[in-house]
């Protein structure tokens, strides 16, 4: 146990390592990756001790002879038992960590989509694939859209890419007052919490921008715009998951002055009470055939569907990992039974039944799986914290809302124990049949 504990401590100390800066301003979470490896290895080493402690604790309870025998074998903590549980711990830890990562990302993205698609209609240039490949929407068209009788307010977004101290970043033009007060935002730091530096333009910056240019607590960043170098200073920081380059949002008028452009990338239309969303959408599509006009709620569902498709592969990877680990458990049990041949022959001579042997094997498998689930869940929770609060933040510059999927983890434990039981029963029956 001393080596396992030392490994866990060493992994924790690795978190103190600075994250190396990469070209473009992003960072590589070197300490986080090393810590994850040490934690998994340390948990695997300690998992055998967990199995022994758990078995010895349960032996104090009065059980039948079959369960007593299974517990005594687990309590002995042979090298093969420890190896079997260690292999499962690695798989369980990775699956538990990924369950947290995917669940936290899903919950965070859903909240962000609620903010991003809070208007009723979303309008962009037809055929545009991104800010770098569009001409933008005509100012006259934007004026016609915002002045429509059914439209209450148009949240128009202007976008350009500018050079910054570390690579490129996004300079956005927004209705500054509306973004600060009227429109819902997911704030990392509320507007007004930071002091704007003298002779700098107040800006609402994304968390990625703030971390990339070290202005989480305020400061100044110089941007190379078409009219020369301009300084921005954050007055508030919002959460955004749309790009990893970061964005600084200034008022429309300032953006137009700095970029010498008049064309926005898109606009979100907030409709008046009682306005029929789809009817107005169809009307505007006929009036402006060059625009892509969509129901924002439907667009949100499409975006969520893309997200789900992207992360569906993680479920398959989790299943593959557990399947391989359970196959390792079965092979480990076969080796354990072969190693215990003399013990089984002695028990048979003493009148121990074939049925009792098979159930002992099944309970051994279940005990190994339970021990692995306990150890793997503990290290998996630590890995989830590491992925969300260290690796993800240093890699992408944004913070996810950490969500613990307790129900999924508990169900996973039940499935693990059942698979261990069934695998043990099947392995025991097959091995015993061969010996006969």
Regions found by a protein language model. Name each.
Residues 3-6, 11, 78-103, 308-345, ...:
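Hydrophobic alpha-helical transmembrane segments of multi-pass inner-membrane transport and secretion
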Residues 5-12, 27-59:
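Membrane-embedded alpha-helical segments of integral membrane proteins
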Residues 12-34, 377-415, 425-435:
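Short helix-loop junctions at transmembrane helix boundaries
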Residues 30-37, 105, 109, 283-324, ...:
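Peri-transmembrane interface segments
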Residues 39, 47-194, 207, 217-219, ...:
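Juxtamembrane segments of multi-pass membrane proteins
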Residues 63-71, 75, 82, 296-303, ...:
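Alpha-helical membrane-protein architecture signal
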Residues 140, 159-199, 204-297, 304:
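Basic-flanked hydrophobic alpha-helices used for secretion and membrane insertion
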């Amino acid at each position: 146990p001393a080596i396992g504990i030392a490994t866990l401590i060493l992994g924790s100390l690795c978190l103190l390592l600075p994250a190396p800066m990469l070209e473009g301003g992003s960072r590589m979470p070197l300490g986080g990756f090393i810590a994850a490896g040490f934690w998994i290895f340390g948990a695997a080493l300690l998992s055998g001790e967990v199995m022994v402690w758990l078995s010895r604790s349960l032996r104090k309870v009065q059980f039948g002879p079959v369960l007593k025998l299974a517990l005594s074998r687990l309590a002995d903590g042979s090298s093969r038992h420890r190896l079997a549980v260690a292999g499962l711990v690695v798989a369980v830890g990775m699956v538990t960590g990924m369950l947290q990562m995917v669940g936290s990302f899903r919950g965070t993205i859903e909240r962000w989509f609620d903010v991003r698609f809070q208007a009723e209609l979303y309008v962009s240039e037809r055929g545009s694939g991104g800010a770098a490949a569009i001409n933008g929407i005509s100012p006259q068209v934007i004026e016609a859209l915002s002045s429509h009788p059914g439209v209450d307010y148009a949240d128009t977004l202007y976008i350009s890419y500018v050079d910054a101290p570390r690579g490129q970043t996004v300079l956005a033009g927004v209705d500054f007052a509306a973004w600060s007060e009227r429109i819902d935002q997911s704030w990392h730091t509320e507007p007004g919490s930071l002091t704007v530096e003298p002779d700098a333009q107040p800006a609402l910056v994304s968390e990625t921008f703030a971390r990339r240019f070290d202005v989480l607590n305020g400061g100044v960043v110089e941007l190379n715009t078409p009219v020369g170098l301009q300084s921005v200073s954050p007055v508030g920081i919002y959460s955004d998951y749309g790009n990893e380059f970061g964005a600084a949002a200034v008022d429309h008028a300032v953006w137009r002055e700095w970029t010498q452009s008049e064309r926005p990338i898109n606009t979100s239309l907030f409709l008046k009470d009682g306005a029929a969303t789809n009817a107005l959408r169809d009307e505007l599509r006929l009036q402006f055939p060059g625009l892509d006009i969509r129901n924002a709620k439907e667009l949100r569902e499409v975006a969520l569907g893309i997200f789900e498709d992207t992360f569906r592969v993680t479920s398959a990877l989790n299943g593959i990992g557990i399947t391989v680990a359970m196959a390792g458990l079965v092979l480990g049990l076969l080796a354990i039974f072969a190693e215990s041949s003399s013990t089984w022959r002695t028990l048979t001579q003493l009148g121990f039944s074939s049925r009792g042997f098979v159930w002992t094997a099944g309970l051994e498998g279940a005990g190994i799986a339970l021990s692995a689930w306990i150890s793997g869940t503990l290290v998996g929770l630590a890995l989830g914290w590491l992925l969300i609060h260290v690796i993800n933040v240093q890699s992408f510059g944004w913070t996810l809302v950490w969500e613990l999927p307790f129900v999924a983890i508990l169900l996973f434990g039940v499935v693990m124990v059942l698979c261990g039981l069934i695998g043990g029963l099947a392995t025991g029956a097959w091995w015993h049949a061969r010996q006969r």
